[in-house]
Amino acid sequence: MSVSRRVIHHGLYFAVLGPLIGVLFLVLYIFFAKEPLVLWVIIHPIFLLLSITTGAIPALLTGVMVACLPEKIGSQKRYRCLAGGIGGVVITEIYCAVIVHIKGMASSELFENILSGDSLVVRIIPALLAGVVMSRIITRLPGLDISCPETDSLS
């Protein structure tokens, strides 16, 4: 498979599925945390939409990063997952820092609350989980034909 096709494949799959994995964790965290954020989710259903749109660009960039990993790292599941998780966290933090400094994009109070330093766990853990899970399953998704047997097995 050509590098450009792998970059497009990884980037799009990460951008579409990655934020959904993060939102799943976020909903579970809010449900079990018994914090006032539960009221925000009930009152503002746009919370999930903001979470997905906030995570789509970092997920796309993480997918491109995972696609561009050298063959030695990309062909081993552990290293690919480690790189995907760390890359997801770093790219998400850089992206959120840029958005907070632009202030024009962070106009709503809820959006600023999500991106503030007080809710670090709301950004880091979903990005880490999405990066690791997507790096793990990316070779099993349709459209990618890798002949490396170690990469194709889920064990």
Swiss-Prot record:
Keyword presence, tRNA-binding: no
Keyword Membrane: yes
GO cellular component: plasma membrane
Lineage top rank: taxon: Bacteria
Keywords assigned: Cell inner membrane, Cell membrane, Membrane, Transmembrane, Transmembrane helix
Main location (coarse class): membrane
UniProt topology in membrane: Multi-pass membrane protein
Induction: Induced by the two-component regulatory system CreC/CreB.
Subcellular localization(s) per the UniProt record: Cell inner membrane
Annotated TM spans: 12-32, 37-57, 82-102, 114-134
Record-annotated disulphide pairs: none
Periplasmic side: 33-36, 103-113
Residues on Cytoplasmic side: 1-11, 58-81, 135-155
Extra remark: Disruption of this gene leads to hypersensibility to nitrofurazone.
Protein name: Inner membrane protein CbrB
Organism per entry: Escherichia coli (strain K12)
Taxonomic path: Bacteria, Pseudomonadati, Pseudomonadota, Gammaproteobacteria, Enterobacterales
Gene (name only): cbrB
